[in-house]
Amino acid sequence: MAFSFSMHAQPTDAADWLDLARRAEAAGFQALYTPDHPGSSTSPFVVLAAAAAVTSTIKLGSYVLNAGIREPILIAQDVATLDLISGGRAILGLGAGHTPAEWAAVGRERPGVRARVDHFIEVAEATVRMLAGDGLATPRPVQDRVPLLFGGGNTRLLRWAAGHADLIGLSGLGRTLADGHTHTAKFSPAVVDAQVELAGGTPVEALVHYFEVTGDAGAAYAKWAVDAEISEAEAALTPYMMAGTPSELTAKLEQSERRWGISRYAVRRPAFDGVAALLAAGPVTAS
């Protein structure tokens, strides 16, 4: 089985970002993702366009764009432009916008769950139609269909994504906390079971929040379990946490593939060296 890893990061300066893009491609990462948090992150399509200029094969995507505060035509225009200048490497990652601080940053009150879900579906479907040629004459994307990545855990949206998305990104994030940015963790394997079932066979990618190459995986899982308020046994099973020697990490990847069919992962920048070494050693391959 081939497992793939994507890198989730954002720039701190130009030279570092361009270097990261080059190194991620050379190491065999499947995609370079960047977040969208209006008011507290860089502009996703600007930094992805910069990465496109210094790479040739790595996919480039938003992870994930807040669909609640953007018009479909502007989303379609940005992603079509990225696909054009990257030679067909764009991925459109969309979410419903569950973080209150993002809505506050644009001077709007976050709607309730039902309204956000309704609006997300409307925006996502309109954007896909435009990318297919309905209402967006120029630019035209290189790909016949720009892959749509849905990021979220809402039950209704997972059912929708099962029939409309090309990839479902599970982050393990739960309720938004009082600061408007941080979230509770929903890392329980039982929750993953339910979400994967809702995905209905659409490929799933897990966002790994904790990653460590170590000879003492038990100690790492014990520490992380406290952070996530789950048991050590659950920490050792959940796809959002990975610890161990290269062979132990490979065994966990295989275990997650057997249980959930998950073979794609996104990791944050601190995991770069460990994942790059894993890719170089050959137990996993870019797919």
Name every feature range the model reports, one short phrase each.
Residues M1-S287:
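Active-site-adjacent structural elements that line small-molecule/cofactor binding pockets in enzymes
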